[in-house]
């Protein structure tokens, strides 16, 4: 079962409303009020459909209707409401006092839709052209930045000191034991030892020993844990043994060379005295 029709559609007037029909409809609604549109044509004596009577009253005959002359503010409101609600004209008309949904729909289709489409198209064109102009101006205004490097020669050695917390560890390790390039043997003579030997350069490698002594004596404020201290002590002992062995080798080489020199020197003196002997005898 469907919805029954409001009228039989037979013998009814169609087309434009006459002034007499408008007066009859207006007088009946002013007397009985709005509503019951299905029975209104029969009770008012009009040969019209109930829907036609309702639309005629709502869109033309109401006393509070504004007809034509839509202001700029109303146009902006219609545009914003259409973006929000779409083609729901009755809801849009409810937010515009005195305006009917039919009038707003007709005004939108004939004028406002074309205006909105033209503005949107113009914004798209402007949006495409402006970035191109900006990019060209930026390309012209941009200048290459030249970074000039400055050569710096380091003439001194700097030791960087870092402040560590109590819980931090020292990761610096002592350098490897110094190995002498020359090997000393007991057969080496005193003349084979270099005369330009620099004792300060030789002792410079033992700077780590003094630093380790300061750490162990408590002069250095840095704190070491047991494991790190044990590793340092082992490296220190190994370094000390290597240094002692090198010094002993150097000392023995010096002593052996001195003994050889004395022996060779004594023989030369004896031979020199022997040559002068006969002259004294004669």
Curated annotation (Swiss-Prot):
Pfam families: Myb_DNA-binding. Residues 9-61, 62-116 form the HTH myb-type domain. Residues 37-61, 89-112 bind DNA. Residues 258-282 are annotated as: Disordered. SMART domains: SANT. One of its GO terms (biological process) is flavonoid biosynthetic process. This is Transcription factor MYB1. GO terms for cellular component: nucleus. SUPFAM superfamilies: Homeodomain-like. It comes from the Eukaryota. One of its GO terms (molecular function) is DNA binding. Its main location: nucleus. Transcription activator involved in the spatiotemporal regulation of flavonoid biosynthesis specifically in the corms of Montbretia. Activates the promoters of enzymes involved in the biosynthesis of the flavonol kaempferol and the flavonol-glycoside kaempferol-rhamnoside. Keywords: Activator, DNA-binding, Flavonoid biosynthesis, Nucleus, Repeat, Transcription, Transcription regulation. Residues 271-282 have a biased composition (Gly residues).
């Amino acid at each position: 079962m469907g919805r029954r029709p409001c009228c039989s559609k037979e013998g009814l007037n169609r087309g434009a409303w006459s002034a007499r029909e408008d007066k009859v409809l207006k007088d009946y609604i002013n007397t009985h009020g709005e509503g019951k549109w299905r029975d209104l044509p029969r009770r008012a004596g009009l040969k019209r459909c109930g829907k036609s009577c309702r639309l005629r009253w709502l869109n033309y005959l109401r006393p509070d209707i504004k007809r034509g002359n839509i202001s700029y503010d109303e146009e902006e409101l219609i545009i914003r409401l259409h973006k929000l609600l779409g083609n729901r004209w009755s809801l849009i008309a409810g937010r515009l006092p005195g305006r009917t949904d039919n009038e707003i729909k007709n005004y939108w289709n004939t004028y406002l839709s074309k205006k909105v489409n033209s503005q949107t198209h113009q914004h798209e064109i402007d949006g495409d052209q402006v970035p191109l102009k900006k990019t060209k101006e930026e390309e012209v205004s941009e200048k290459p930045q030249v970074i000039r490097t400055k050569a710096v020669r380091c003439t001194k050695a700097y030791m960087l000191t870092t402040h560590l917390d109590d819980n931090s560890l020292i990761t610096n390790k002592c350098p490897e034991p110094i190995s002498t390039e020359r090997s000393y043997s007991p057969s080496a003579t005193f003349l084979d030892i270099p005369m330009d030997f620099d004792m300060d350069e030789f002792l410079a490698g033992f700077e780590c020993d003094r630093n380790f002594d300061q750490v162990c004596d408590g002069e250095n404020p840095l704190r070491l844990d047991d494991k790190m201290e044990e590793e340092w002590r082992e490296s220190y002992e190994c370094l000390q043994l290597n240094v002692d062995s090198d010094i002993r080798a150097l000392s023995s080489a010096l002593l052996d060379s001195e003994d050889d020199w004395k022996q060779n020197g004594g023989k030369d003196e004896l031979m020199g005295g022997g040559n002068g002997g006969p002259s004294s005898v004669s």
